């Protein structure tokens, strides 16, 4: 009898040891089968938990229990929350080891233009017209963020924006459809690589779908009046480019679109995004946007708001907690089909598998600090900052001569470390190189470089005046009705010029500004945006001629706020040129695509592959570009199209391609 019992016990242990793991845990199984297997095992409550993204708070005493119950699908980590990598992995361990099914939590953070190493604001990145360099910056940002446990960034923003009063114009690529599409796709590739599950990669969440940048009067959250034609021609193409680049997530916007809020809009979220484009990632609402459907006036209460959002195609809600608290009852009462919940959960799980969270849930680097602010990161930040800056005026004062006797550096931004913009990731101002430090490091040994406060006289060979708007004058809901330089800075520039100085104005801005009162008093005018960690070095590289400026404007700079909205690609009218004001014409102070350098380029031999093309046929264009100056430099070749006899009115000019090339003096290249 004892022998029999021991044999049975041994057989039991053998069977237990060889029990088959659930299919969803098998990393070799097809992704779709893993998703279906896991979904079939989930309760309704667990499904709704996957659709919930609350805000991480270090003082939240209920979070561990919520994760254990499977009620947290993702956590949004706000700037300043200081989620340490060890704490992130502790929370993930609860999800993986203590929840019933072991579904990992996805951690999201705003990595907008860098994590610890900060690159120029996105509008500045677009001014580089160098998508390859933008992709490199996103790759570095992903590496830093991933090392600290971040799985997904709420970036890129690809909202076409044509009103500089809108504070969030700083976060996108400006007024042009193609620039937003090209740079958005480049950032997606940089964040995700060819496999977003690899070490050092993070998922991209493209935002804000759709029309957010067309807010009435440049006032954040305002409604938009956009026809389906306007959506398809202007506002949707950048999102399509990002979806085609493989973005795993899309964020729905705050605004309404011609009466239907974007976060309850079945046309855009379901018909276009999913059915037409084949998007199979998940849609995330913007912060509290599901709850705010009540404020829009289309939902009587939170339960109705949740049903409308999920039905339209919002898979996961950020912070509002309505899915978890109301949708169980809505499903039981047949006000929401259970199949729609499954659709949303399937999308979320698909992304978690794609990001490798099930197979590698603990992503933090064992020594994350080693991955931050590396020499490569700082080199890339310096190059991108320099290429993003746009020289708008130069009356022969730049580049600065090494033989100058004296340089006065002045203005609020001369020693400021407020150089990161509104979204700063985990950037530390102490890492930033100031303009003062950058200029001092590159000035000639015999040049007296001084701050204005250190000089009894304001007279010098050259005055470098650092002006601009701080990071809290742009960004989300930081809209301006007056877009001139604030704080009396125009007066400072004028006074320095009237005292006989050569005046070089460096502007640190997050939007196009009205600089009409500055231009007459500036011998040189450089737009620096908010350039990031290597700001001062990049400015000095350009001022002293270590590099030639190569940035071009991604937005039009107006002569007056009264011209807004203003953009280059407006449609032709029956009376072209007559759309003016009593006091001024309709032309910008500085147009889209404009930017000077320290050399000259000559264009020649424009060639087309064919002079006549049938509908659907492609036409190739080539042109030869020659550096006719004396300095190695980069030039952006821009190709525009005008359809002179179309079925509908078309833009007078439309950017259809561009190439940035570097040429030595006398060198030619065909592009």
Predicted regions and their residues:
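Sec-dependent N-terminal signal peptides
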Residues: 4-12
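Glycoside hydrolase catalytic-domain context in secreted enzymes
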Residues: 12-671
